[in-house]
Amino acid sequence: MGKKIAVVLTYYFEDSEYTEPAKAFKEAGHELTVIEKEKGKTVKGKQGTAEVTVDASIDDVNSSDFDALLIPGGFSPDQLRADDRFVQFTKAFMTDKKPVFAICHGPQLLINAKALDGRKATGYTSIRVDMENAGADVVDKEVVVCQDQLVTSRTPDDIPAFNRESLALLEK
């Protein structure tokens, strides 16, 4: 049975950190809903290779509508974490112990949600100190799975491992 996966995304996301996991999730039979501030608008990746149409506004969704959350990296998470609606949406997944998949700069939303304390995680080099300051035990590995809930990776190079572990967690 396919799972419903929320994807929080805005302008200048890292293209492959959305497109490759999205493809893997869809091929495995899961349904993705791209969430941003405004339904129907198109957001572009920072590399210029991906354009995504927003399926739903953050104002029209609830974490209870979904089984898991994907947070692609790039500049998108830094913009979204300035909006408390996205922070609270992210926090709800962690509080409810639903799977959360965050790659590269994706953990920035988890930092603002105060959801990393006591957890093993990884992320892009430039945010690792921020993650540590948020209480995370930061590990420099291609993928880190914590408590059968949180999957994190560092960069686009880690996408195959990120996808593998994310899909495995969805099967549990």
Swiss-Prot record:
- The question of whether Cell membrane is a record keyword is answered with no
Q: Which UniProt keywords apply?
A: Hydrolase, Protease, Stress response
Domain PfpI endopeptidase residue range list: 3-171
Q: Which gene encodes it?
A: yfkM
Q: Which organism is it from?
A: Bacillus subtilis (strain 168)
- In its UniProt entry, what is this protein called? General stress protein 18
Query: Its domain of life?
Result: Bacteria
Q: What is its EC number?
A: 3.2.-.-
Taxonomy, top ranks, is: Bacteria, Bacillati, Bacillota, Bacilli, Bacillales
Example GO molecular function: peptidase activity
What this chain does, per the entry, is described as: Functions in the protection against aldehyde-stress, possibly by degrading damaged proteins.
What biological-process GO terms show up in the record?
Answer: proteolysis
Catalytic residues as annotated in Swiss-Prot or TrEMBL: 104 (nucleophile), 105
Matching InterPro entries, A to Z? Answer: C56_PfpI-like (IPR006286), Class_I_gatase-like (IPR029062), DJ-1/PfpI (IPR002818)
